[in-house]
């Protein structure tokens, strides 16, 4: 009888403890498992804690149903001593780690969006991206500038004038005096249609920033690269982003010229010229931009990865950016059910390949290394709080106009080159930033519309969703954000699991990621 009373007393005491710390709410956390252990990710502190099985199961029960039923379910599987042990460990975690005490976001408020915006935009601009021309000698089937895609401009014929370019460079000069880095990027269309223009911009930038270092880089489809151009890029220390989607048949099925012909051979010629010219610097200065296109399959991913076997001169440690086509850009006829059905998606392939390399059971690959190392580096370098902190970054949004601006051919300012052409402009080279638009549309409205959705989300501290996904229609689109949320949650769940699996195998093996520079 005494034992029963003691048990009931402890259960009642435990209920009072949970009611006191949770006040009838459920903390915002993510419980997940690997094959070897159970884990808790706590949103309030950004911490990951390993849990004993009894602790994990008790938390699962408490989070999934009302308290009396949760405890009854727990005691149907575990002994009373395991219940006491689980509760005591939870008490210690609450007291010493500050976890299980965050119940939702009341504000974003953590990022520079909420500082002195005018002062930041007046002094810390870091990068210009110049839309050198709207013209392009290619017509890739998934290009956002195709007539079938409603959220971007169509293929155009306009070129940026030197007047606009020089005014943009002057603007960078006068608005970057507190910035740690300054860069001018050339974009299109295809910027190499105007190589002379690029040279003029580089020389003007050097004259304006005579005592300050400025980086230059370019994004190109590669078909116009000559030895002269490669030499110029190397001399001026250009990183070059060049587009190639895989072996010839895969690349040529989507990346065509204006006459409908494949472009693989011309791209490879340009790429080979760059690699030879850059020599030992090629791996650090050349970035491949790849688009993973239908029909989706594990076999297709393997064939794309085999590009390095077909081009043995391609550096094995090259950086790679690989993505799916942007939502809505693919021609409707290609998107049949069979084409888009995936038995192994790209992210899963990247995780499996990276995990095998890490554990020594397989070889790595430049694609999987680039995919996973960046995500893991962001997670490793996250801010960890000793107690719940009720301020959060504005998802993955940059501060409009702070890190970079995209300058269109006519001198208008956009947040970046990826955002919809219908999204609100943030200024122009003649008048500067439109602070009111930045504050109202991109900060206040984004927060007001997002907070009800984000406030109860366990991934709010890890989220990479930004203006690109949410301003497709010209104003904040909550439906578009919700579609992105599903994929983001799935991706972050996988990231947590991968991180924990790798730490189980070698706790120090990821330390090199602390040195990865994140933008």
Question: What are these model-derived regions, one by one?
Answer:
Residues 43-84:
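Short amphipathic alpha-helical interface segments
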Residues 5-50, 83-129, 177:
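N-terminal [4Fe-4S]-dependent radical SAM core
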Residues 78, 89-92, 109-231, 235-236:
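Conserved alpha-helical substructure of the radical SAM core
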Residues 342-387, 418-464:
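C-terminal accessory region of radical SAM enzymes
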Residues 444-492:
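Cysteine-cluster motifs in flexible loop/terminal segments that predominantly coordinate metals
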Residues 165, 169-185, 194-325:
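Radical SAM/AdoMet-radical enzyme domain recognition
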Residues 167-185, 481-519:
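Short Fe-S-cluster ligation motifs
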Residues 2, 254-268, 272, 276-396, ...:
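Radical SAM enzyme [4Fe-4S]-AdoMet core and its adjacent flexible, acidic
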């Amino acid at each position: 009888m005494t034992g029963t009373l003691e048990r009931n007393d402890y259960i009642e005491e435990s209920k009072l403890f949970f009611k006191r710390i949770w006040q009838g709410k459920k903390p915002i956390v993510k419980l997940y498992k690997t094959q070897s252990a159970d884990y808790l990710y706590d949103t309030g502190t950004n911490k990951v804690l390993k849990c004993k099985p009894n602790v994990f199961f008790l938390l699962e029960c408490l989070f999934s149903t009302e308290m009396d039923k949760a405890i009854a379910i727990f005691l149907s599987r575990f002994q009373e001593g395991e219940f006491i042990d689980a509760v005591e460990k939870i008490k210690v975690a609450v007291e010493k780690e500050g976890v299980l005490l965050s119940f939702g976001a009341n504000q974003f408020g953590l990022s520079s969006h909420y500082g002195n915006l005018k002062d930041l935009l007046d002094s810390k601009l870091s990068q210009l991206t110049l839309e050198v021309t709207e013209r392009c000698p290619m017509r890739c089937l998934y290009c956002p500038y195709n007539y079938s895609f409603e959220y971007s401009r169509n293929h155009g014929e306009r070129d940026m004038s030197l007047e606009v370019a020089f005014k943009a460079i002057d603007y960078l000069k006068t608005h970057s005096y507190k910035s740690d880095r300054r860069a001018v990027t050339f974009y299109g269309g295809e910027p190499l249609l105007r190589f002379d223009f690029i040279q003029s911009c580089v020389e003007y930038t050097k004259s304006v920033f005579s005592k300050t270092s400025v980086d230059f880089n370019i994004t190109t489809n590669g078909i116009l690269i000559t030895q002269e151009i490669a030499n110029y890029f190397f001399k001026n220390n250009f990183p070059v982003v060049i587009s190639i989607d895989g072996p010839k048949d895969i690349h040529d099925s989507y990346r065509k010229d204006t006459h409908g012909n494949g472009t693989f051979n011309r791209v490879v010629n340009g790429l080979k010229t760059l690699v030879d010219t850059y020599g030992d610097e090629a791996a650090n200065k050349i970035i491949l931009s790849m688009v993973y296109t239908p029909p989706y399959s594990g076999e297709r991913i393997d064939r794309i990865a085999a590009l390095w076997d077909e081009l043995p001169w391609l550096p094995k440690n090259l950086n790679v950016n690989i993505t799916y086509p942007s939502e809505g850009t693919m021609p409707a006829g290609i998107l049949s059910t069979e084409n888009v059905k995936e038995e192994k998606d790209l992210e899963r392939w990247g995780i499996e390949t990276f995990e095998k390399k890490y554990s020594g059971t397989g070889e790595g690959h430049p694609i999987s290394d680039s995919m996973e190392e960046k995500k893991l580096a962001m997670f490793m370098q996250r801010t960890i709080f000793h107690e719940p902190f009720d301020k959060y970054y504005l998802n993955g949004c940059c501060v409009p106009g702070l890190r970079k601006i995209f300058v269109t051919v006519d001198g208008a300012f956009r947040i970046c080159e990826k955002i919809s052409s219908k999204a609100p402009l943030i200024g122009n080279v003649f008048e500067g930033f439109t602070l009111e638009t930045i504050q109202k549309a991109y900060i206040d409205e984004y927060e007001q519309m997002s907070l009800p959705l984000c406030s109860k989300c366990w991934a709010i501290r890890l989220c990479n969703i930004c203006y690109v996904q949410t301003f497709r229609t010209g104003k904040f689109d909550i439906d578009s954000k919700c579609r992105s949320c599903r994929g983001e949650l799935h991706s972050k769940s996988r990231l947590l699991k991968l991180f924990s699996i790798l730490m189980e195998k070698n706790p120090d093996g990821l330390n090199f990621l602390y040195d990865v520079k994140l933008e």
